[in-house]
Amino acid sequence: MENYAKSFLSTSHSEELFNSLYSTIDGYQISLNSNKRKHSKNKSYIYGEIDFSNFTKLLAECKPATDSIFYDLGSGTGKSIIISFLTQEFKKYIGIEVIQELHESAIQVKQQLDTSLNKYGGLISTESLIFKQNSFLKEDISDGDIIFANSTCFNAELMTELSSQVETLKI
């Protein structure tokens, strides 16, 4: 289905919906709890978030075609994927997150989004929203057109591996 949320929702309504979807989700706390148990030594797992307004502006600068595929590598609770879905017209929106608890939060948000969009009578489908629980280094992203990675805390080794992976992207 190619009826994009952007066609039905104003920017202010999209932001309002986004804020309500994330009102009870604390990605920082989820990440902190997970890192204490599993990843405490690796600083590459430090969680960070994006702002709706600024990320929307960044995406608009990319000028994606409607057949473009958007990836977020290290998608956390899925914020960039949800913002992209609400404000842009991509063919697919794919988030890849290694931390299970963050991934589960993203799935929960997608389910809440489905419920919120029911009032449009099935005209807006979240079928193109895909969340994968895995290391992005183990996923084939070569079909991606726009790749986002909030990599400010990625260590040198991870950045080198990511650079090699990005070289496989279509041009």
Give the label of every model feature segment.
Residues 1-66, 104-141:
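S-adenosyl-L-methionine
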Residues 79-90:
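Conserved SAM-binding loop of SAM-dependent methyltransferases across substrates and taxa
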Residues 67-76:
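Conserved class I S-adenosyl-L-methionine
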Residues 92-97:
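Conserved SAM-binding motif I beta-strand of class I
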Residues 154-166:
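A short, conserved alpha-helix within the catalytic core of class I
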Residues 80, 101-105:
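Conserved short alpha-helix immediately C-terminal to the canonical SAM/SAH-binding motif I
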Residues 145-157:
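A short SAM/SAH-binding and catalytic strip from SAM-dependent methyltransferases
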